[in-house]
Amino acid sequence: MFRVKICGVTTPDDARLAAEAGADAIGLNFVPGSVRCLNMEAARSVAAAVPAGVLKVGVFAGADQAEIRRIATAVGLDAIQLHGHLEGVAGLVDPPATCAALADMQLIRAVRLEADGLAAARRWLAAAEAAGARPALVIVDASTPRNAPGSALGGTGAKVDWAALAREAPLGIPIVLAGGLDPDNVAEAIRITGVIGVDTASGVESAPGRKDPHKVRAFITAAHHALDTQTA
């Protein structure tokens, strides 16, 4: 679906910057409480600046499927990323049933590498598949506390343990790495983990929600080079 995604884009200029630098996908954040969360007017403006051929990915946590569909249609999203907690009874949780209800859409599931590895992710994916749904991609992000608010679900700069991820058995779904990636470490992260793609937000920012042109270009160049080398 994509190899390099720049997430948490909040302005049309940053969307154009990422696309021109070679990003395959742009992430638009709709998670309540996030500093990068977009209202509908801003989301439409950002989406309109994304050229054809670059995926517009909507990032959600805890939203019901009707709300996700409404926003996807209004903004013109190409794919949906469920970024909420895997388990829990309250808060920003995205249960397998949400994935099943959106099975006709391009779906991405963000999971977190915990102390027990990807055990919770495997349970969630098995339940989703039993309900007739299967994400096209899994994004592995850094661990967050159970029932953490939207501000702590992503874009925090926290890193995944790359060596621990490399030891995990395959999920049967392509994995994209997120969590604390920046221009200086993305090539090493790809080399160690063997992932098929990478995703960053805070790692290419000058301030929360504002992308740094130099960092964006450097990150995308380094990521594409490392991914090309890996598959050569």
Feature roles, as predicted:
Residues 15, 43, 68-69, 125, ...:
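Generic hydrophobic/aromatic pocket-lining and core-packing "Φ" positions
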Residues 20-22, 74-75, 133, 192-193:
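Structural motif
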Residues 1-5:
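Extreme N-terminal starter segment of soluble prokaryotic enzymes
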Residues 18, 80, 138, 161, ...:
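Conserved, mostly hydrophobic/aromatic
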